[in-house]
């Protein structure tokens, strides 16, 4: 998860509030100090932190909780709302025909982001093309072409042509039939005058619907200087913050952008083509505080087009085979890293803490389960009850695991089957269908 340290510290502050017997000035002051410390360690601007602290304190001590909400819940909700206000609501890039120009310094992850952004739109049903107008950096053409080829995205570039505005113009002509056209531009190691002029020249040719500034999260509060400089040059309409999963300064970058007239459109949270997320402040803060992001989880399932032929009607009658369980593990594997998926799930409002070691153990256990099921016969997968001691030994040998782990898998399957049977009374067939659909299942 992005900003692990910040999220952990903020959750610690909220847990104090949630476990308190009463809300008073001492409790609020203590929680505010913890929040201040967490934000400052994440490189958020001191003035912004103090302003946020004052608003939280003022509201927590003077506002009356709305009907149906106790004082503790109200204070937690205030913190949630004010954190959203701190980082801004985000820039909405609609799913429609458009041209997008990417700008930014060298090393910001701009080229990789161009391919990720193209993948984002293409997976949502839009024909997408990428134009390489970076004629400055050696290897930019080859890198971007390879990334696009890997994802099946149309690529346009002119190797050897150093006239970036001309390449951009030719690229637009060659990609007229595409819905979304993404123009990748050159960067420099600093805000040099020739870089700014080239951006202006390309902008004059491209006339993009959106000009997105790509920034490395590690620059922290310096993000505001970049945003202002590029905004003056081309009038940027949004920001993409990359590498947010690998720095403690991400809070500074997020808040610095919000301090300017622009806002964040996307965030990069990993290395794969799907690790670019549309930025929505409420969902981001919800995940940061451990409240989950079910909407994001559903979108992730839909994005990788998870399909399964699980028979929902049979499941509702109590039939949940090991084959069904295997399909669910396969679906989870497609959706991305286990830690990222689990952090989209809500756990009691404030979240639970799992160490990296615990996540790794869980991941290895699930992988072992798949190996075990790969060593079973179709008959065993359909009817686990026939798996006796001798079969367990054979399956363990075939999968390179211990018999105890095979038994553990069978117990886990039995528990899941029991839970599904329990849904029949409380959830109902239609609601079960809706749930499966929301988790990426096709209609049944």
UniProtKB/Swiss-Prot annotation:
SMART domains per UniProt: AAA, SRP54, SRP54_N
Positions annotated to bind GTP: 104-111, 184-188, 242-245
EC number(s) per entry: 3.6.5.4
Molecular function (Gene Ontology), one example: GTP binding
Keyword match Phosphoprotein: no
CDD domains cross-referenced by the UniProt entry: SRP54_G
Intracellular or extracellular location(s): Cytoplasm
Superkingdom of the organism of origin: Archaea
Record-linked Pfam families: SRP54, SRP54_N, SRP_SPB
Primary localization class, coarse: cytoplasm
Keywords: Cytoplasm, GTP-binding, Hydrolase, Nucleotide-binding, Ribonucleoprotein, RNA-binding, Signal recognition particle
Gene Ontology cellular-component annotations: signal recognition particle
SUPFAM superfamilies: Domain of the SRP/SRP receptor G-proteins, P-loop containing nucleoside triphosphate hydrolases, Signal peptide-binding domain
Catalytic activity: GTP + H2O = GDP + phosphate + H(+)
InterPro entries from the UniProt entry: AAA+_ATPase, P-loop_NTPase, Signal_recog_part_SRP54_M_sf, Signal_recog_particl_SRP54_hlx, Signal_recog_particle_SRP54_M, SRP/SRP_N, SRP54, SRP54_GTPase_dom
Top EC class, one word: hydrolase
Alphabetical list of Gene3D superfamilies matching this protein: P-loop containing nucleotide triphosphate hydrolases, Signal recognition particle SRP54, nucleotide-binding domain, Signal recognition particle, SRP54 subunit, M-domain
Gene Ontology process terms (BP): SRP-dependent cotranslational protein targeting to membrane
Protein family: Belongs to the GTP-binding SRP family. SRP54 subfamily.
Record function comment: Involved in targeting and insertion of nascent membrane proteins into the cytoplasmic membrane. Binds to the hydrophobic signal sequence of the ribosome-nascent chain (RNC) as it emerges from the ribosomes. The SRP-RNC complex is then targeted to the cytoplasmic membrane where it interacts with the SRP receptor FtsY.
Subunit structure, as described in the record: Part of the signal recognition particle protein translocation system, which is composed of SRP and FtsY. Archaeal SRP consists of a 7S RNA molecule of 300 nucleotides and two protein subunits: SRP54 and SRP19.
Swiss-Prot/TrEMBL domain comment: Composed of three domains: the N-terminal N domain, which is responsible for interactions with the ribosome, the central G domain, which binds GTP, and the C-terminal M domain, which binds the RNA and the signal sequence of the RNC.
Entry protein name: Signal recognition particle 54 kDa protein
The organism's taxonomic lineage, starting at the top: Archaea, Methanobacteriati, Methanobacteriota, Stenosarchaea group, Methanomicrobia
């Amino acid at each position: 998860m992005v900003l692990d340290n910040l999220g952990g510290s903020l959750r610690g502050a909220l847990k104090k509030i949630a476990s308190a017997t009463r809300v008073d000035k001492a409790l609020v002051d203590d929680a505010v100090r913890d929040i201040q410390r967490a934000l400052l360690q994440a490189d958020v601007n001191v003035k912004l932190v103090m302003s946020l602290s004052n608003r939280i304190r003022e509201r927590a001590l003077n506002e009356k909780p709305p009907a149906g909400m106790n004082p503790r819940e109200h204070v937690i909700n205030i913190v949630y709302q004010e954190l959203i206000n701190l980082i801004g609501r985000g820039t909405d890039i609609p799913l429609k025909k458009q041209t997008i120009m990417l700008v930014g310094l060298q090393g910001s992850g701009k080229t990789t982001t161009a391919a990720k952004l193209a993948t984002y739109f293409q997976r949502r049903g839009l024909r997408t093309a990428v134009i390489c107008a970076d004629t400055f950096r050696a290897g930019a053409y080859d890198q971007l072409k390879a990334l696009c080829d890997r994802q099946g995205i149309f690529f346009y570039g002119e190797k050897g042509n150093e006239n970036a505005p001309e390449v951009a113009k030719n690229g637009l002509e060659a990609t007229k039939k595409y819905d979304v056209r993404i123009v990748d531009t050159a960067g420099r190691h600093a805000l040099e005058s020739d870089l700014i002029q080239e951006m202006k020249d390309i902008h004059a040719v491209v006339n993009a619907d959106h000009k997105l500034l790509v920034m490395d999260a590690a620059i922290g509060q310096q993000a505001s200087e970049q945003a202002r400089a590029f905004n003056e040059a081309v009038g940027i309409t949004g920001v993409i913050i990359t590498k947010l999963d690998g720095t403690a300064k991400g809070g500074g970058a997020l808040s610095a952008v919000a301090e300017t007239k622009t806002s964040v459109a996307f965030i990069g949270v990993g290395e794969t083509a799907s690790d670019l997320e549309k930025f929505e402040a409420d969902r981001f803060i919800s995940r940061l505080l451990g409240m989950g992001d079910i909407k994001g989880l559903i979108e992730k399932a839909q994005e990788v087009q998870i399909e399964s032929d699980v028979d929902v009607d049979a499941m509702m009658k109590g039939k949940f085979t090991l084959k069904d369980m295997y399909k669910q593990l396969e679906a989870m594997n497609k959706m991305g890293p286990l830690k990222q998926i689990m952090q989209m799930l809500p756990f009691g409002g404030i979240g639970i803490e799992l160490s990296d070691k615990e996540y790794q153990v869980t991941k290895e256990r699930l992988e072992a389960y798949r190996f075990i099921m790969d060593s079973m016969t179709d008959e065993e997968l359909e009817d686990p009850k026939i798996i006796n001691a001798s079969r367990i030994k054979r399956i363990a040998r075939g999968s390179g695991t211990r018999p105890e782990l095979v038994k553990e898998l069978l117990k886990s399957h039995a528990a899941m089957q029991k839970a599904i049977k329990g849904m029949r009374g409380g959830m109902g067939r239609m609601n079960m269908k809706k749930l499966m659909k929301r988790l990426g299942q096709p209609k049944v």
